[in-house]
Amino acid sequence: MHNQAWNILLTTSLTLTLAATAEAQTARPARYADGVYTATGEYGGQPSHITVRVTLKDGILAAVTVTPHAYVPRSLELQRAFAAAVPKVVVGKRIDQVRVGKLAGSSGTPRGFNDAIRQIREQAARR
């Protein structure tokens, strides 16, 4: 009788543990909706801007493209360098943890990028 009671207790405990684990994994909906999002980030006094396009999957940046819009040659050069460098830094990271500082010699363009990412977070947020 003792072994039978022990087996029932063990089986019940295992069943409850598995059920609790499954519930914990499915109870929390994703914070951001998967999809492709685009936003234009502003920065500087002129103002300057860049367009940022991201593919979001499970809250993680799967792809990032930055389109420069500067017309002053030096500014365009900095925006292009930033656009080439930023995917290597942010792809694979959670969107809610992405914030870029000076990168590829540019200190202004990251502000525009961060502004665009903020807008994209708002677009993708599940309400």
PLM-predicted stretches and their roles:
Residues 28-127:
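Active-site- and interface-proximal helix/loop "cap" or "latch" segments in soluble metabolic
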Residues 22-26:
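Boundary at the C-terminal end of the N-terminal hydrophobic targeting segment
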Residues 1-10:
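Bacterial N-terminal signal peptides that target proteins for export
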Residues 9-17:
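Bacterial N-terminal signal peptides
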